[in-house]
């Protein structure tokens, strides 16, 4: 396995090894190898920076299951929601230049933008776009971008039809679509696309020459990881998420060598090249790492009890919490078959980035192992690989119990209220758009018009509820429940994820499809 040392970075010359009494590379390498196996992950790439230098960068495992091509420190991964911090950094640059303020109304730059309420539309600020307290629900609108043909402008337009889940600024609910809206501000303010601003104002100054913002950039690389997921109980390659329509929220592809430069810059309040340059002011560095939204602190499962923080907040593109008595600034990212975690401990000038080509919690397990080693956690220390594996088993057991209870309560002898042909026809949801239900070979088939992957055979469950078994196996199956008018016609259908473990981006619950009347 190849290690890329600090000579790869312009920010430092050859870096010394981590102190032997704190960190043993061979022990950590063995731990990673075990983690790959236990948490069912083909490959990972890891870098650690401290005091302005990259201490090590290294790849582990393979880029694609069943292949021999190894992951190294230059292997590209989709970093998903770790993109959000790049978007807020680019906004901070414009704030420093006086081109916008965090508390400017969004409609100052996007006059046609609307949300669910005129008051919220008028009051919503740039800060609100990136702090997850707009009143929209968790993952609201994610089905607009996921495997869809909608572009960013269309998504920003359609989010006006999303119904609120709470009052404005009253509760935290993570979202992606408003980061897309934030990306739409850049052409109005900077005269450049979000992509161009990130490339010219962030990547180029930091020397991040191996990073990009498009799916084409990622797929054109000869050293890119392949996404993997668990299907039918087996680790398998899954389709790559095309992220061009969500790039400001999750579209960057990078590697740990480039991201180490990013970490060093963030740990030095926006300075780079040994302090000779600046991305953004120290004031903006503080603002981005200041709490903006209070996060709930649920009790973790017993194996992870030690990870319960004393405080948790969301800043501007970053999560803030404590660990081992230090403030920790971090974020995670996840797309189909790809996961990432960036963790910074500002008081220690310490940063860790871990990229993996699976949807497991390996990134978290290895992050906490490194933090324990480098921050001197008291002994005996947790075995985080085992702890996260146990937590996963607990979650899956609970989900299985819920599904079994649902099966036990099902009225399997019930029949649909109508002949199947009466459910067929065109439907429309204000938020998503058009869908269709067709009778094909004696069964109903559901299709989402703007999402070609969403083609599902409707398997009767009970009464007027069916289950959409998507032909693309990596998609989460959904209950589809039809409601009838008093005269026996279909009035609407609504959806809900079948699995309790379904990712929140499968926000079926936000959809309400009604029949489209035939033109007269």
Model-flagged regions — what are they?
Residues 1-6:
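Bacterial N-terminal signal peptides that target proteins for export
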Residues 14-15:
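N-terminal signal peptide c-region/cleavage motif recognized by signal peptidases
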Residues 18, 119, 145, 249, ...:
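Short, flexible active-site loop motifs that bind/organize anionic cofactors or intermediates
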Residues 21-57, 157, 187-200, 204, ...:
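Catalytic loop of the DD-peptidase/beta-lactamase superfamily, centered on the K-T-G motif
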Residues 62-176, 183, 190-192, 196, ...:
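Active-site-proximal loop and beta-strand segments within enzyme catalytic domains
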Residues 176-177, 362:
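Short acidic alpha-helix initiation/capping motifs at coil-to-helix transition points
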């Amino acid at each position: 396995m190849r290690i890329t040392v600090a000579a790869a970075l312009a920010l430092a010359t050859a870096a010394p090894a981590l102190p032997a009494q704190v960190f043993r590379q061979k022990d950590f390498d063995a731990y990673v190898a075990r983690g790959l196996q236990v948490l069912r992950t083909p490959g990972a790439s890891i870098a650690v920076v401290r005091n302005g230098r990259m201490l090590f960068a290294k790849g582990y495992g393979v880029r694609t299951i069943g292949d021999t091509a190894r992951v190294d420190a230059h292997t590209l991964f989709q970093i998903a929601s770790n993109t959000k911090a790049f978007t807020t950094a680019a906004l901070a640059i414009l704030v420093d230049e006086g081109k916008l303020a965090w508390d400017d109304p969004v409609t100052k730059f996007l006059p046609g933008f609307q949300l669910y309420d005129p008051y919220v539309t008028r009051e919503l600020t740039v800060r609100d776009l990136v702090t997850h307290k707009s009143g929209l629900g968790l993952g609201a609108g994610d089905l607009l971008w996921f495997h869809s043909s909608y572009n960013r402008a269309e998504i920003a337009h359609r989010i006006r039809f999303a119904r609120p889940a709470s009052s404005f600024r009253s509760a935290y609910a993570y979202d992606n679509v408003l980061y897309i809206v934030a990306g739409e501000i850049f052409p109005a303010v900077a005269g450049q696309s979000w992509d161009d601003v990130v490339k010219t104002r962030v990547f180029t100054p930091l020397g991040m020459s191996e990073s990009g913002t498009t799916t084409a950039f990622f797929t054109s690389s000869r050293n890119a990881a392949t996404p993997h997921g668990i299907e039918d109980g087996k680790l398998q390659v899954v389709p790559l998420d095309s992220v061009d329509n969500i790039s400001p929220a999750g579209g960057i592809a990078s590697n740990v060598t480039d991201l180490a430069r990013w970490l060093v810059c963030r740990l030095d309040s926006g300075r780079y090249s040994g302090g000779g340059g600046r991305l953004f002011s120290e004031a903006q560095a503080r603002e981005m790492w200041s709490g903006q939204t209070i996060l709930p602190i649920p009790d973790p499962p017993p194996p992870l009890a030690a990870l319960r923080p004393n405080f948790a907040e969301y800043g501007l593109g970053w999560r803030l919490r404590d660990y081992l008595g230090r403030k920790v600034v971090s974020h995670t990212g996840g797309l189909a078959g790809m996961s990432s975690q960036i963790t910074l401990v500002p008081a220690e000038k310490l940063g860790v980035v871990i990229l993996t080509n699976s949807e497991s919690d390996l990134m978290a397990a290895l992050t906490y192992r490194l933090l324990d080693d480098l921050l001197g956690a008291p002994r005996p220390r947790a075995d985080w690989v085992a702890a996260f594996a146990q937590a996963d088993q607990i979650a899956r057991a609970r989900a299985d119990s819920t599904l079994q209870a649902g099966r036990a309560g099902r009225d399997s002898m019930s029949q649909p209220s109508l002949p199947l042909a009466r459910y067929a026809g065109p439907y429309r949801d204000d938020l998503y758009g058009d869908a269709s239900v067709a009778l094909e070979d004696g069964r109903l088939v559901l299709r989402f018009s703007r999402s070609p992957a969403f083609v599902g055979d409707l398997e009767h469950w009970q009464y007027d509820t069916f289950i959409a078994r998507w032909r693309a196996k990596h998609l989460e199956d959904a209950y589809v429940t039809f409601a009838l008018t008093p005269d026996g016609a279909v009035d609407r259908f609504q959806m809900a994820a079948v699995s309790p473990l379904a990712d929140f981006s499968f926000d079926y619950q936000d959809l309400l499809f009604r029949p489209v009347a035939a033109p007269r």
